[in-house]
């Protein structure tokens, strides 16, 4: 339901309309925020309107083990990879953009990564039996939000994105 993901889904809708093929949007509900269920329902409604297959994948965090952001990220990718394999999808598109690329570099630098670790996110990365594709790496977040505004699309703003308590 975030701006970046909805912009990718909007572009996917047009791509699918012009080129055919099967596409699906996956929403991972981590059940970490009270508004998560409503946001998943909002995405489901929008995808139905756009004629895009949609599935909600649920992850329920274990209590009190710390490192929740990293665990949620690992669970998100595992859930999406498993779903793709079971449903015959080889490519998993994510909405990482230019700012995410810069944040990843800075986070890795802070953690003391070597030269290889400091390399940027690749546009395509094999992961198990699928390939993660990041088609928006060159896009600026402001441009993605502008695309949504120009098309009257409302997105959900995750308050934790503005929180510096977690490294992502």
Whereabouts are the PLM-identified features?
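Core alpha/beta nucleotide-donor-binding catalytic domains of modification enzymes
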Residues: 3-168
């Amino acid at each position: 339901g975030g701006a970046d993901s909805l912009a990718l889904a909007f572009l996917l809708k047009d791509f699918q309309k012009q080129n055919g093929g099967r596409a699906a949007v996956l929403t991972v509900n981590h059940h970490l925020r009270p508004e998560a269920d409503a946001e998943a329902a909002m995405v489901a409604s929008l995808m139905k309107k756009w004629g895009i297959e949609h599935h909600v994948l649920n992850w329920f965090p274990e209590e009190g083990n710390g490192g929740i952001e990293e665990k949620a990220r690992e669970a998100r990718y595992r859930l999406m990879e498993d779903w793709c394999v079971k449903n015959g999808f080889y490519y998993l598109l994510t909405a990482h953009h230019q700012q995410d690329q810069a944040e990843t570099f800075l986070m890795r630098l802070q953690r003391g990564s070597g030269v290889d670790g400091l390399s940027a996110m690749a546009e395509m990365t094999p992961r198990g039996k699928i390939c993660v594709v990041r088609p928006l790496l060159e896009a600026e977040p402001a441009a993605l939000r502008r695309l949504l505004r120009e098309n009257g699309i409302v997105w959900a703003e995750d308050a934790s994105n503005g929180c510096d308590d977690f490294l992502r």
